[in-house]
From Swiss-Prot:
HAMAP family: Ribosomal_bL20 (MF_00382). The keyword Membrane does not apply. This is Large ribosomal subunit protein bL20. Binds directly to 23S ribosomal RNA and is necessary for the in vitro assembly process of the 50S ribosomal subunit. It is not involved in the protein synthesizing functions of that subunit. The keyword Signal does not apply. Belongs to the bacterial ribosomal protein bL20 family. The gene is rplT. One of its GO terms (biological process) is ribosomal large subunit assembly.
Amino acid sequence: MARVKRGVIAHARHKKVIKLAKGYYGARSRVYRVANQAVIKSGQYSYRDRRNKKRDFRKLWIIRINAAVKNYNLSYSKFIYGLKLSSININRKILSEIAIFDKISFKKLVDYSKNALSI
């Protein structure tokens, strides 16, 4: 039986991991064992944070809408409920954009919400 030498394959695998760890600090970017652990952990962080990003942005949009609605003496929850009653279906991302960049349109949305709530 022929002897199997895996030097080329191992070297390629090590190179791949070191390439993925480029930019990491110290041994994490140079030593295969440490770099491999760092790459695995970074993959776990990436997976987790791709999910958290959705939550974080939704939180941000809600905070922005709440801050904008406070100027019109209305709470976020009442504003959203009023929009639902007046059957205006705009998602929170777009509402926050309108609140920042188009104050006049946002004021109209607040008025619709207040009318639906009869405030």
